[in-house]
Swiss-Prot record:
Region Uracil-nucleotide binding in RNA target: start-end pairs: 899-903, 1043-1047, 1122-1126
GO molecular function, one term: RNA binding
Compartment(s): Cytoplasm; Cytoplasm, P-body; Cytoplasmic granule
Organism of provenance: Homo sapiens
Low complexity composition bias: residue spans: 45-58, 485-502, 626-639, 763-773
Role this protein plays: Sequence-specific RNA-binding protein that acts as a post-transcriptional repressor by binding the 3'-UTR of mRNA targets. Binds to an RNA consensus sequence, the Pumilio Response Element (PRE), 5'-UGUANAUA-3', that is related to the Nanos Response Element (NRE). Mediates post-transcriptional repression of transcripts via different mechanisms: acts via direct recruitment of the CCR4-POP2-NOT deadenylase leading to translational inhibition and mRNA degradation. Also mediates deadenylation-independent repression by promoting accessibility of miRNAs.
PTM remark: Phosphorylation at Ser-714 promotes RNA-binding activity. Following growth factor stimulation phosphorylated at Ser-714, promoting binding to the 3'-UTR of CDKN1B/p27 mRNA.
Residue positions, PTM Omega-N-methylarginine: 796
Name recorded for this polypeptide: Pumilio homolog 1
Biased composition (Basic and acidic residues): 250-272
Annotated stretches, region: Guanine-nucleotide binding in RNA target: 1079-1083
Cytoplasm as UniProt keyword: yes
One GO cellular component term noted in the UniProt record for this chain: cytoplasmic stress granule
Length: 1186
């Protein structure tokens, strides 16, 4: 092909040689006077050729080198080229403007010859898919590089004998402009599937923005060509498309005469291998929708989206964009498109095009789209959401066209539902089965023709759908049989829906409700119920059809039949995202799931959704049908299919890897976590996971109900006007766990209908591997552990490798989990604590956190809450808290936050409580004393326990005194012992210090202990200490720590000890005063010495000379000694002070030059101004005095 263009203002004929499929026709218009620029497919620089009829070089069908930047074949000088497409001589512009491009009656800009028929009818369907998206988006995800470097369409009118294929080999294999020449911006909320570009080195998340181009390079050419493509005319026939103001009138007279495809041409297309493509049930109109409004490619021509509402029908969902790009560079194998059925999608009332499905098609679903429901545009980001208003707050998420094309537009064929926008209720979590061979992320569109799609789109999951997991993950024989059996008699009976396992979420202030309570609490009409059973119906029909599929937990945020996302913002946090069940082996689904789905189908089909309301108030009312024994379905490539999950088809009640909550797989139960009358959790999902030795404490994946869905009659977490019912009541019956001989799902006789079926909190940060067998609480290794409240904190990090939600697990992703109210959140905290931390319980009381005292005590905010409450708590409330923390008191003592709770009990608790805690400390005094937080508990205990217990506690440190004294934590305990305990009981400490006084006095921690001994011990105990101090006074006064001990003796010691120290200082005042540490000692000597000793020290300074100057002058200039001089001025006798002043006067002028001398002058001025003494020249304030 060739296109006349201007290359650097010179007319040339641009020819491409990148495709080996192109045929060179002699009738191609070529100006012999124009040089030919020949580009090769391998990236060579453009070379001028002398003649236009020269044969095209056979370019290789090469893909770009991964390490190269941009696309192979891009020239560095291409950014300097201006292109001008020349029209045919007989052609006139239809509308003018950048996006006008109308048609001439005699000319078609769409190629009419077979010279671009590139495939020769031999290319496989997957290659056509690639080529189609290449034509649409230049191999760049969502128009990443929608800048043309090659010709798009022939401008001539060639022979019309061949079929009108639209696929070239790789149109933009050699893009003239790469990503580096133009800035690319990322629109807000635009997300795509990773790896969606042909070229591995392209910016995956880049989307070409109308404003992102700086020079408008090549944009007009693209817009000119695309706006005149048949897609433009085709869109106009359907009542929508680009509505440029300057082209509307010009197109009015041409609409009826312009047909994009003739009937015979369309037939040729179908005969030649269905070159048109269909993706996800959506028509792709010639690969490009040139709606300029949606994505204007000219800088400054970014039109507003005011016309979008006009382009859409009143009931249309504008979320459907163009076909999604395939995600690999090479062609996909044909096996990826197996198990698919072709569909017929009417593009127009007069045109029918058969299209092959892509790999994410919905099998067997005919989705007709009338002329008003065709795609709106390629880059229509603004019209891809529909706002629905509910009484509750709704979070409406904007999704891109690439994400939303997995929904089916089945709303046109669902007039019997008539779902109003205000009638939607978010679906609870259900397990759905996707149809075989289709997108494993969908929740099964088998019921799309009845209720609309119950779809979980791909953006919730990050796993690759192709061949990663076994294709047959359900044992659906039993479920399908039960569904077929019960479908007939549930069609018209409203009572059949009494046990419907569908939990409708109510208002923002309520927990999930059963249909009965939902009807009581708010108005429930058939529309609400129909929306609620939407996903269940899809699941039921999928099982009834016997189609194996991927198990998917549909989220509380759901997609209605129009594809819009509806989220109940009033739901409790942590409940909004889906959980995908992807097990390495088959997962068992109970029959009640299928029965619930069939019941939902019957309720919706007959409009009897109001009959969903049951007559009882229990949390769940499962369908009363017998549970057949599901059998594992064999799969050839599944290595685990040969080993049954039942362990010889029998659940051993004593085995740690057996059923989760039951003894037998088919043991009758009153109700079992909402699964069915005889289908306990162990018989459904638990037994399947039992083979791993794991427990599913948080993951009952029932068909239509959540395990933690509570009724209005349940007292758990139900806030009344006065208080909150203790959380541990339903779990532990006080403080002990009920060891029922039956499964947990079977309520005990003492448990009312409102008793929670939720197991106790699991014991790891992500739901540990603890199994609940026979009511006992065990971890994954089979060791029975404490079931007391708060025990989960002790084993929070003890989850085994086989934990269901552990990071090494392959069944669940911990980041996608949703927990019950009492379960451990991803942060490791219970929901009660999480809610308290989020200020949802501003008036929480101590009695309301019963069962969670340990957990609260180990939390920063919870511990502070308990501390504040304990100060003013009643004795009964203190005892309530004490009973829970006593057994794990040591654990709290060494906890960063829990230790404060223990301290509060030593401070405010009763004597019995203090003694009980002191008993817990016995035997652990040394370890606690050396621990950062335990040492604080020991210190508090020493302050408040009786002397007998004090003596017992202190005696445990005997033999470890020096170790504690030199420890950063233990030294505080020793100091507290010296302060609080009777000195007679501390003789072992004095004995331990013998010969170690100097070493300890120069120790950062030991010096503190020495000072405490000097303060509190008996004189005969301190004498040996002081003797050692006097022997090392000269060294200690100059030590960074020892000087504090000497100062302490000078301040608090006996006069004779002070005199000994002063005697050591005399004669060395000048030297020691200039020492950083000794200067402090000299100050204390001047301050605390007797009058005689003080006078001697001051006189030494005044009479002593330091070289040519006096010692006083030297000291006044020194950074340390000047403080000694100031202290001397303060404490000297009046006569001696006058002598000092006269000694200082000759040096006043010089002192003004020194920083520390100014301190002396300030002291003098302050002193004499206070006393009114005239110092002559001193009275004039020197400059810089501070």
């Amino acid at each position: 092909m060739s296109v006349a263009c201007v290359l650097k203002r010179k007319a040339v004929l641009w020819q491409d040689s990148f495709s080996p499929h192109l045929k060179h026709h002699p009738q191609e218009p070529a100006n012999p006077n124009m040089p030919v620029v020949l580009t090769s497919g391998t990236g060579s620089q453009a070379q001028p050729q002398p003649a236009a009829n020269q044969a095209l070089a056979a370019g290789t069908h090469s893909s770009p080198v991964p390490g190269s930047i941009g696309v192979a074949g891009r020239s560095q000088d291409d950014a300097m080229v201006d292109y001008f497409f020349q029209r045919q001589h007989g052609e006139q512009l239809g509308g003018g403007g950048s996006g006008g491009g109308g048609y001439n009656n005699s000319k078609h800009r769409w190629p009419t010859g077979d010279n671009i028929h590139a495939e020769h009818q031999v290319r496989s369907m997957d290659e056509l898919n690639h080529d189609f998206q290449a034509l649409a988006l230049e191999g760049r995800a969502m128009g990443e590089q929608l800048l043309p470097g090659k010709k798009f369409w022939e401008t001539d009118e060639s022979s019309k004998d061949g079929p009108k294929g639209i696929f070239l080999g790789d149109q933009w294999r050699d893009s003239a402009w790469g990503t580096s020449d133009h800035s690319v911006s990322q629109p807000i909320m635009v997300q795509r599937r990773p790896g969606q570009s042909f070229h591995v080195n392209s910016e995956v998340n880049s989307v070409l923005s109308p404003r992102s181009e700086s020079g408008g390079l090549g944009v007009s050419m693209v817009e000119y060509v695309l706006s005149s493509s048949p897609g433009d005319s085709c869109l106009r026939k359907g009542g929508f498309g680009p509505r440029d103001a300057d082209s509307d009138e010009n197109d009015k007279g041409e609409k009826k005469n312009k047909g994009t495809f003739d009937g015979d041409k369309l037939g040729d297309l179908k005969e030649e291998g269905d070159v048109m493509d269909k993706t996800n049930g959506l028509p792709v109109q010639n690969g490009i929708d040139a709606d300029v409004k949606d994505f204007s490619r000219t800088p400054g021509n970014c039109q507003n989206s005011a016309n979008e509402v006009d382009l859409l029908g009143p009931n249309q969902n504008g979320s459907e964009g163009l076909a999604q790009l395939t995600s690999t560079n090479g062609a996909k194998p044909v096996e990826d498109f197996s198990n698919m059925e072709s569909q017929s999608v009417p593009l127009d009332p007069m045109e029918h095009v058969g299209m092959e499905p892509l790999q994410f098609d919905y099998s067997g679903t005919q989705v007709p789209v009338d002329s008003a429901a065709a795609t709106v545009g390629l880059f229509d980001y603004n019209s891809q959401q529909q706002l629905f208003q509910r009484p509750n707050a709704l979070a409406v998420q904007q999704l891109t066209a690439a994400q939303q094309q997995q929904y089916a537009l089945a709303a046109a064929h669902q007039p019997h539902i008539g779902l109003a926008p205000a009638a939607f209720v978010p679906n609870p979590y259900i397990i759905s089965a996707a149809p075989p061979g289709t997108d494993p992320y969908t929740a099964g569109l088998a019921a799309a023709a009845t209720l609309g799609p119950a779809v979980v789109p791909h953006q919730y999951y990050g796993v690759t759908p192709w061949g990663v997991y076994p294709a047959s993950l359900f044992q659906q024989q039993a479920a399908a049989a039960a569904a077929a059996t019960n479908s007939a008699n549930q069609q018209t009976t409203p009572q059949a829906q009494q046990g419907q396992q569908q939990v409708l979420r109510g208002g923002a202030s309520q927990r999930p409700l059963t249909p009965n309570q939902n009807q009581q609490g708010q108005q429930t009409d058939p529309l609400v119920a129909a929306a609620a059973v939407n996903s269940a119906l899809a699941f039921g029909q999928g099982l009834a059809a016997g189609m194996p599929g991927y198990p998917v937990l549909a989220p509380a945020a759901y997609y209605d039949q129009t594809g819009a996302l509806v989220v109940n913002a009033g739901a409790r946090n942590g409940l909004g995202a889906p959980v995908r069940l992807v097990a390495p082996a088959p997962v068992i689904i109970s029959s009640s799931a299928a029965q619930a789905a069939v019941a939902a189908a019957a309720a919706s089909a007959n409009g009897a959704a109001g009959g969903l309301a049951g007559t009882t108030n229990g949390p769940f009312r499962p369908l009363g049908t017998q549970q057949p024994q599901p059998q594992p379905q064999q799969q050839p490539n599944n290595n685990l299919a040969s080993s049954s999950f039942y362990g010889n088809n029998s659940l051993n009640s004593n085995s740690q890897s057996s059923s989760l909550f039951s003894q037998g797989s088919a043991q009758p139960a009153n109700t079992s976590l909402g699964f069915g009358s005889s289908s306990s959790l162990g018989a459904t999902l638990g037994s399947a996971l039992g083979g791993f030795g794991t427990a599913v404490a948080n993951s009952n994946t029932g068909s239509g109900s959540r395990r933690d869905s509570l009724t209005g009659s349940s007292d758990l977490y139900k806030r009344t006007s006065s208080s909150l019912t203790p959380i541990g009541h339903s779990f532990y019956n006080g403080l002990s766990f009920s060891s029922s001989p039956g499964p947990v799902g079977m309520p005990l006789p003492s448990q009312g209908p409102g008793h929670s079926q939720t197991p106790p909190p699991s014991l790891s940060s992500h739901g540990s591997s603890s199994s609940l067998n026979l009511g006992g609480l065990t971890n994954g290794s089979g060791r029975y552990i404490s079931a007391a409240p708060g025990a989960e904190a002790k084993y929070r990090s003890a989850s085994s490798a086989s934990s269901l939600f552990s990071p090494s697990s392959t069944l669940f992703s911990s980041s996608r989990l949703r927990y019950g109210m009492s379960d451990v959140m991803p942060s490791g905290r219970s929901r009660l604590l999480e809610d308290f931390r989020n200020n949802r319980y501003p008036n929480l009381q101590l009695r309301e956190i019963a069962g969670h005292i340990m957990e609260f005590s180990q939390d920063q905010h919870g511990s502070r809450f308990i501390q504040l409450k304990l100060e003013r708590a009643t004795p009964a409330e203190r005892q309530l808290v004490f009973n829970e923390i006593l057994q794990a008191a040591y654990q709290l003592m060494v906890d960063v936050f829990g230790n404060y709770v223990i301290q509060k009990f030593f401070e405010f608790g009763s004597l019995e409580q203090k003694l009980a805690l002191a008993e817990r400390i016995r035997g652990h005094v040394l370890s606690l004393a050396l621990q950062m937080y335990g040492c604080r508990v020991i210190q508090k205990a020493l302050e408040f326990i009786p002397s007998d217990q004090q003596n017992e506690m202190v005696r445990e440190l005997d033999g470890h005194v020096l170790k504690c004294v030199k420890d950063q934590n233990g030294n505080h305990v020793v100091q507290k012992c010296i302060e609080c305990v009777q000195p007679q009981s501390l003789q072992f400490i004095i004995d331990a210090f013998k010969g170690q006084v100097f070493a300890l006095s120069t120790h950062p921690y030991g010096c503190r202990v020495i000072q405490r001994i000097l303060e509190h011990c008996l004189p005969d105990q301190t004498l040996p200490i002081l003797e050692e101090l006097h022997q090392h006074t000269e060294q200690l006064v100059q030590d960074q720590y020892g000087n504090y001990v000497i100062q302490h003796v000078l301040e608090h010691g006996r006069p004779e000890d002070k005199s000994k120290i002063v005697a050591e200082i005399r004669g060395n005042v000048l030297v020691l005063s200039q020492h950083k540490f000794a200067s402090n000692v000299v100050e204390k000597c001047v301050t605390h010495a007797s009058r005689t000793e003080r006078a001697v020290l001051i006189d030494e300074v005044c009479t002593m000379n330091d070289g040519p100057h006096s010692a006083l002058y030297t000291m006044m200039k020194d950074q340390y000694a000047n403080y000694v001089v100031q202290k001397m001025i303060d404490v000297a006798e009046p006569g001696q002070r006058k002598i000092v002043m006269h000694k200082i006067r000759p040096h006043i002028a010089t002192l003004r030059k020194y920083t520390y001398g100014k301190h002396i002058l300030a002291k003098l001025e302050k002193y004499y101004m206070k006393n009114g003494v005239d110092l002559g020249p001193i009275c004039g304030p020197p400059n810089g005095i501070i």
